[in-house]
Amino acid sequence: MGDPAGIGPEICLRALREPSVLKMCTPVLFGDAGVLARLKSPSKNKTKVISLAEWKDTRRIEAPLIIDCAAIDAKKVRPGKVSAACGRAGYLYIEHAICAAMGKKISAVVTAPIHKEALQLSGIKFPGHTEIFTALTRAKRSCMMLYSDKLTVSMVTTHIGYRDVPGKLSVARVLDVIELTAEAMRWALHREPRIGVCGLNPHAGEHGLFGGQEEENFVKPAVARARQKSINVTGPLVPDAAFTTNQRMKFDAIVTLYHDQGHIPFKMLAFDTGVNITLGLPMIRTSVDHGTAFDIAWQGKADQTSLFSAIQVAVGMAAGKGQK
C-alpha cells in the first residue's frame, strides 16, 4: 500500500476494483483497512478484508483480498505529512509482502510509493525499496531498472549522493548490471538485446581528461568482459548525448551509473507509464515510478496509470515463469 499518508492507498483501492486488473490477476493488498476506510472509496467488487493471522492460514486465494496488517492507528494518519509511524507502516507492508512471495503464496509483489524521510525517521536505515528487497531476499546481486516502451534504463548505483558514486563503481558491479540488464531484456524481447553503457564524466571522460578515470578503470573493462560473454554492449557512451532520439534508438536498454543519470531522461519520456523493476531477486518485484505525491494525497487527484502498468508487467513476468 505504500506510505499511508501518500497516494498509495487510493491508487491501490482503484486497482482492487479495476476490471482490467481483475482480468489479469487476483490482487492481494497488504495495508491497513482503517486507512483505506477513511478514503471513503469502497471497492465495487467483493473484496474481502482479513487479518494477518487469517492470512497465514489462507491456502486458496479466490477473490481480491485486503490483508489488514494493523501497522498504524488510522485515526492518526495525516494525509501529506511525513511521520515515523507512516514510515514504519510502509516498511511492514513490504516485509509481509516479501514473506508471502518468498513463501510462494503470491506470484509477485507490486509496490506503491514509500517516503524515504519517513522511513529514516522510523529508524529503518534502508534508503529505498531496492535496498530493502535486496537485503530481505538475500539477493547476491540486484539493480534497479526503469522500463517502458519508450526507454529502458538500469542503474549501477541508486540512492546515494553524487559525490559517493565514484567510490561505489567497480568493474564487477558495472558488469553485474550489464548482465542483469541483458538477461531481463532478452526475456522481454525474445532476442539478444542491444545494451548501451553511459560514462560518468563530461564527454565520457575524453580518454581520462575529465574526472577520475572512471571510464578507463571501470566502464571499459566491464564492457570488454561483457562482450567476451557474447553480450551486445557498447560503451562508454557520452552521457549528454546518449538519450537523444537518434542515439537511444540504437539500444534496447541503457545502463546508467547513478540515479539521476537514468531517472531524468526516463521520467521526461515515460513518467506516467514507466515501471520500476528490481532485477536479480529470487522473486518478482515491480513498482510505480513516482513518489508519494504528498501535495495531492487523499484528494482523488492521483493518477493510477503507473501502478496499473506495474501490475501488468508483474503479471507478464509471472506468466513467463510459469506462475499463476
Name each model feature, range by range.
Residues 60-64, 148-153:
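Beta-strand-turn-beta hairpins that frame and shape the catalytic cleft
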Residues 114-116, 124, 150-151, 159-162:
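Short acidic/polar capping segments at secondary-structure boundaries
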